[in-house]
Regions:
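Conserved, well-structured ligand/cofactor-binding cores
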Residues: 20-153
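N-terminal signal peptide c-region/cleavage motif recognized by signal peptidases
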Residues: 14-19
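Sec-dependent N-terminal signal peptides
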Residues: 4-13
Length: 153
């Protein structure tokens, strides 16, 4: 009676012991690698070059805002409200930082409704990996803190 239980536990955790860490650089992710990453237990890490691009892409809009330029979704609202200021030029200083964070949290909640049927775990994981890979390519303007949340998924 105990043997089948032990065997089933071993079979359940075996795939996790062979899991690999896949490196994302924003340039070389293939469909085959993406599918492999989607398996349970597979992990991702961003390469040093990818992290450098993430940091640079975050710095660009911050610097532009500091120079007084309106940055869509950072210092000004979205869509029809694009002419409304959300935060002042110094978006990393208070009270502008809190105003910008609050604004973007509100926008995420508005757009993040989940309706059934939910995506399969593998599909959800692939979407997260694609987004992290886009960040590593340096085209998103996302912060390092935001990018750090993705590998945990």
């Amino acid at each position: 009676m105990k043997k089948p239980l032990v065997i089933s536990i071993i079979l359940a955790i075996a795939p996790l012991s062979f899991a690999a860490t896949h490196n994302l650089d924003g340039r070389t992710l293939t469909v085959d690698e993406l599918w492999a990453i989607s398996a349970p237990g597979e992990k991702v890490a961003v390469t040093p070059e990818g992290w450098a691009r993430i940091k640079a892409s975050y710095k660009a809009p911050i610097d532009a805002a500091t120079d007084g330029r309106d940055i869509y979704g950072l210092t000004v609202n979205y869509g029809a409200l694009k002419d409304q200021k959300v935060a002042g030029a110094s978006v990393e200083a208070e009270p502008n930082r809190s105003a910008s964070i609050k604004f973007n949290e509100r926008q995420m909640r508005i757009q993040a409704a989940g309706l059934e049927p939910y995506f399969d775990d593998r599909i959800s994981k692939m979407a997260m990996v694609i987004r992290l890979n886009q960040m590593a390519a340096g085209y998103t303007g996302m912060s390092e803190a935001a990018a750090n949340a993705f590998p945990e998924y």
